[in-house]
A protein has these predicted regions:
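Short, small-residue-biased leader/transition segments that mark boundaries at the very start
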Residues: 2-9
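Short coil/turn linking the two alpha-helices of tandem helical-hairpin repeats
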Residues: 137-139, 166, 171-180, 241-244
């Protein structure tokens, strides 16, 4: 199911997400003076403007992140109206908003800002993975499919992309196989030609969808010892033997 696919993808990177969060909190503690904490979004954004004008990009990004937490609407408006989109810091600020909205589960806004970031860094794998996840959460599985395929062109062993594509093609194959079987069972006295057509249909499903699922899931096992991927590969192997 879609929910199972979503959970699978979430589980695959939750540890990395936790570590990134801890690193981020530690960095904020080191970079921000105590006076920053507890300020309003407008106060923080005023400091962001000052930091940007002084060329202190790292400090500006840190303040911008705090501003997003203090008031996301004001911070987003600041991004659209006060940030030079051609500057080096602009995509970093877009990424701050993308991550913030993702954490707030505002997937439409998160998707918007990941796309904004990717305009400047179209081959950034972590951003592409996050963008694909947002596409999936917004119900755009076909778009997520294309984005994950792009991820694998850049990083063939990417775990999340291989998990998603492996599960996607396996579930698609199961759906196609079920329809073939149901249609064949409706025939009360199948002829040899009808049986041959049925077997050819199964063979096509295996060669295409099951075959793709197998390739992606085998890659998953090369990177991560996933029990679920192993079980699915066993099912595919069993069907392969039945078709021979």
């Amino acid at each position: 199911s879609r929910r199972q696919r979503q959970m699978c993808i979430r589980d695959s990177y939750i540890y990395t997400l936790k570590m990134k969060t801890l690193t981020l909190l530690f960095s904020l503690f080191l970079m921000c003076p105590l006076s920053v904490w507890g300020q309003s979004a407008d106060e923080l954004l005023s400091k962001v403007s000052d930091a940007l004008s002084e060329g202190k990009d790292d400090y500006a990004v840190s303040l911008f992140r705090q501003a997003a937490n203090a008031g996301e609407d004001r911070t987003e408006m600041f991004y659209w109206t006060n940030v030079d989109k051609s500057s080096e810091v602009a995509p970093r600020l877009a990424d701050v908003l993308a991550v913030h909205y993702k954490e707030m589960r505002n997937y439409d806004k998160a998707y918007l800002f990941y796309k904004e970031f990717l305009q400047r860094h179209p081959e950034d794998v972590p951003a592409l993975v996050s963008c694909a996840e947002m596409e999936m959460m917004r119900g755009k599985e076909k778009d997520a499919l294309k984005t994950y395929e792009k991820v694998l062109m850049l990083d063939a062993d990417n775990l999340q992309a291989n998990i998603f594509l492996g599960n996607y093609y396996y579930l698609q194959a199961e759906k196609d196989k079920k329809k073939l079987e149901e249609d064949y069972k409706k025939i009360t006295s199948p002829t040899r030609m009808q049986y041959a057509r049925y077997r050819n249909g199964l063979s096509d499903v295996f060669t295409n969808s099951y075959g793709k699922a197998k390739a992606y899931l085998q890659r998953v096992l090369q990177v991560f010892p996933s029990m679920e991927a192993g079980n699915t590969l066993e099912k595919i192997k069993k069907m392969e033997l039945e078709l021979k």
